[in-house]
């Protein structure tokens, strides 16, 4: 990193931190705590406060039917409470959100190491960091102290240390990510492919043993802290059966609101198995391009997640520009970007009309969620198709100016 670029990055991180810190201490933070686009049943800050209140009064934080998050987040908020209360909590969350921008920069730099011929990427890492840090989908969850922002941070750390070939730190970050959100286990195999490309001497069994060691350490530490093992049941259950039907940006809540109980188990299985169906085929087909497929699967994970928020969209949409040569071959970027923005704005209006004004209903709000899912799924498919095109032309440079046609 050249000195001038270091100063620019430091200035960018400082601007992002102070902007978020200022907004976190205004009425905007209180407003965002209750916005379903930012706060979900498994990431909302108010639910953490409820769990913390139960814990401080000698009760099991998972006994109230409100707190479903990882005990790691409870420990973090409890330590912040001891150090100075809500102001320290906001400072910590803002710092973590800003540090995510640093790891985005480092990942963009490592992308060039993984792609020495610059077949996929020629974009400046600093610009990728700008896109991430100044994206409202990124800093609004940081202002709202959302747990999804911490999940994004650990996910970025996992990808970065995998791209560095540091298997012990990678396994630790992967354990942290899975402990916060068990669904993140879907990223284990594609992120392992990144590690394998950078350090071919590492075996999967070796990584898995270290991963289990760190995960066991987190479970034991949480058990001592809570004096209970209820955290092994309650948080996992809410991800598996989605019994909290609070409206969110996802597809599950409305579907299971209307579903007869006789069919609930079957469709829970369908929703759970759907993301798994894409992981192995995509990873096997493009095993030699592990970083772009990991980012694509992050987008897929946010599409089928039980309780998604705008924070889940931010990490996928902000990392895509790393592969600017792939984006140049994406045909539907304008359509998909407009669909995502349109759905987010329309969804906020429909939710306000439904809940606040009482002149709408859930059907209108869920329709905006379907538009969001359609735009996101089309963007993922467009990215994967463009990735295959760029890869094919790189291996067949003599056909560079010959357009490919679909076989009828």
From Swiss-Prot:
GO biological process annotation, one example: attachment of GPI anchor to protein
Family: Belongs to the PIGU family.
GO cellular component term, pick one: GPI-anchor transamidase complex
Top-level division of the source organism's lineage: Eukaryota
The species this protein was found in: Schizosaccharomyces pombe (strain 972 / ATCC 24843)
Complex formation: Forms a complex with PIG-S homolog, PIG-T homolog and GPI8.
Subcellular location: Endoplasmic reticulum membrane
Name of the molecule in the record: GPI transamidase component GAB1 homolog
